[in-house]
Amino acid sequence: MAHQGKQSNEGSEHTSTSSLARSADQNQLDFELDFYGRILERNPNYVDVLRVQGNNLTRKGRFAEGLQIDKRLVQLRPADPLAHYNLACSYALLKRPDQAIKTLRRAVELGYRDFRYMREDRDLDSIRHDPRFRQLLREYENH
């Protein structure tokens, strides 16, 4: 019995530590969102900050706001395959498969080639089983 109690205590300590770590991560994320938001108020086209802010908004689950950032990045960097890839992810997270597939195709046309990551990226879960997604991979993966 004492052994089971010890395991239980260790588990609760681990849970508390994990909760503290998650809380610290969220506090850091909130800080960054505020900090980078202020920078963008002064310089709305600061590409490096936009990239970080878009990623942070997505991590926070604020997908619609992340989409707006990703759209702006594509406007600022129309030939950047990563900007298009991130925009495709935003569309997929918002369950907009037509736009996600179209934008993902554009990312690949512009040179995005990390197909292994594309297959595993959780942001693309909503389109992973779409025949157009599989077709896109078949078309470009071996070129």
What function would you assign to each model-found segment?
Residues 1-38, 143:
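Long, contiguous interaction/recruitment modules in multidomain scaffold/adaptor proteins
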Residues 5, 75-76, 93, 110, ...:
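Terminal, compositionally biased segments used for targeting/anchoring and flexible tails
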Residues 21-25, 37-95:
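Alpha-helical adaptor scaffolds
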Residues 98-115, 138-143:
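TPR/TPR-like (Sel1-like) alpha-helical repeat modules
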